[in-house]
Amino acid sequence: TGQTVVVDNKPGANGFIAVRAVLSAPADGYTVFVGSNSTLAVNAALFKTLPYDPVSDFSPLSMLMRSPALLIVPGQGPHKTLSELIGQAKSQPGTLNYGAGSAGYQLMAESFNDAAKVQTTGVPFKGASEAVTAVASGTVQLAFAEMTSAQELVKSGKLRALAVASEKRSPALPQVPTASEAGLPGFTAYTWVAAAVSSKTPKEETDKLAALFTRIETLPETREFYERIGAEVMRGGPEEMRLFQADEIKLWKRIATQAKVEQQ
């Protein structure tokens, strides 16, 4: 478009800070929220009350990408396989802590606890990168992390990936088994990212932005960039995103109920 774009990262508080910044800005189409499944779906499952409504406070623009979660442990830690990790969790209850930088990663870990029939204890962090760093340093013993943020640390040996929570292995880390291959049949977990604006934004501006994102998502360089970071394009405009978001909120509420996670 020839227009300058300023990226303003606002981590922390389960995305509440970023959401507040977007919703308090002028609704003129110049402030776009690029949010994850945590802010746009998972928070609705984890919190009794939210300072925002992930559906009615936003007008969807476009789905952007999704990335399978990695189950990571310290690179020099004792666990070399998922079976070894689960074995310790069962034989020595209470000895393993997981890091969680958002509501999404917390529910992934609790879903893992439920599927593996173990109990690891959550330690909250301000953001996903802090949780990943805590695993690399051994401050916590495991975490679920986005492929895009953890793969370089896995390649360097600072982290060890025990499994990728997807139906098939990731081309970005082909040596890492799927959770099913590693001994946890059917376990999958993805993070996704989508774009939205305040629902107070005029429809004309919303339509322009949605069309722009549609064009961006079809560019070969967009697909190449996502593949390089271990993600994949998620194509879908406002209506597709609206339906997808509704399904995701239902999914994460079901996961929270099944894993017996109490709402905060």
State where each predicted segment sits:
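Stable alpha-helical elements in mature extracytoplasmic
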Residues: 14-18, 38, 42, 81, ...
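N-terminal (or domain-start) structured segment
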Residues: 1-56, 93-96, 104-105, 117-144, ...
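Short beta-strand->loop
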Residues: 51-64, 99, 119-124, 141-142, ...
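An extracytoplasmic/periplasmic, membrane-proximal ligand-sensing/linker region
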Residues: 155, 203-264
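Short, well-ordered alpha-helical scaffold segment located
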Residues: 77-78, 149, 168, 178, ...
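Short secondary-structure boundary segments
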Residues: 36-37, 75, 146-148, 166-167, ...
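Hinge/capping helix and adjacent helix->loop/strand transition within the periplasmic-binding protein
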Residues: 24-30, 45-130, 179-181, 192-225
